């Protein structure tokens, strides 16, 4: 959730909303919980749009004009098709675990969502790995993408030690 505080800060300075695309329902709920820890003090309103929950309850949340929408790709597409959510005021788009979304076949849904948000926006793409599909998406849908790498691919963490314990089968 490296994007939580910068997102809240950015939205406090500008009009518009944030949109976070999460891979799973569980991740979407976790993101919402963490954002609310930071956002309560600024009266942050969120709407979580995930499968397995009532569309009607989600529509009620949307009507309260949330600052941030956190959604799984499929459920967001459902809301777009039913015209119950409007993304024209999205100023910050965050794709969390983009590599896994593409691995799981969500590329068509992601492209549909990217077409529904304004061209003038900040886009943040978070990925544990950076396969060519993710790089291609970044080049297609981002203006002047900047790659920030925590550690070069294939490097071991310095402070991690590994140990092997040999145990008998009966233990």
Whereabouts are the PLM-identified features?
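Switch II of P-loop NTPase G domains
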Residues: 1, 55-58, 107-108
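Nucleotide phosphate-binding site architecture
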Residues: 8, 28, 56, 77, ...
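Conserved nucleic-acid-binding Ia/Ib motif block in the N-terminal RecA-like helicase ATPase lobe
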Residues: 13-81, 88-92, 135-139, 147-150, ...
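Motif I (Walker A/P-loop) of helicase-class P-loop NTPases
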Residues: 1-9, 16, 32
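Short, intrinsically disordered, charge-balanced linker/junction segments flanking boundaries
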Residues: 167-171
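Post-DEXD/H (motif II) to motif III coupling segment of the RecA-like Helicase ATP-binding lobe
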Residues: 32, 86-95, 99-157
């Amino acid at each position: 959730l490296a994007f939580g505080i910068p997102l809240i800060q950015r939205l406090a300075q500008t009009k518009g909303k944030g949109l976070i695309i999460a891979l799973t329902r569980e991740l979407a709920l976790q993101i919402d919980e963490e954002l609310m820890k930071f956002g309560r003090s600024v009266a942050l309103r969120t709407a979580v749009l995930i499968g397995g929950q009532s569309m009607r309850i989600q529509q009620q949340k949307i009507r309260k004009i949330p600052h941030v929408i956190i959604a799984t790709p499929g459920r967001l597409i459902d809301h777009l098709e039913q015209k119950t959510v409007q993304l024209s005021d999205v100023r910050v788009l965050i794709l969390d675990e983009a590599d896994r979304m593409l691995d799981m076949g969500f590329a068509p849904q992601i492209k549909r969502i990217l077409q529904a948000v304004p061209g003038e926006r900040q886009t943040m793409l978070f990925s544990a790995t950076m396969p060519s599909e993710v790089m291609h998406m970044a080049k297609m849908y981002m203006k002047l993408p900047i790659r920030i790498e925590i550690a070069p691919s294939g490097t071991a963490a310095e402070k991690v030690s590994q140990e092997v314990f040999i145990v008998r089968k009966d233990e």
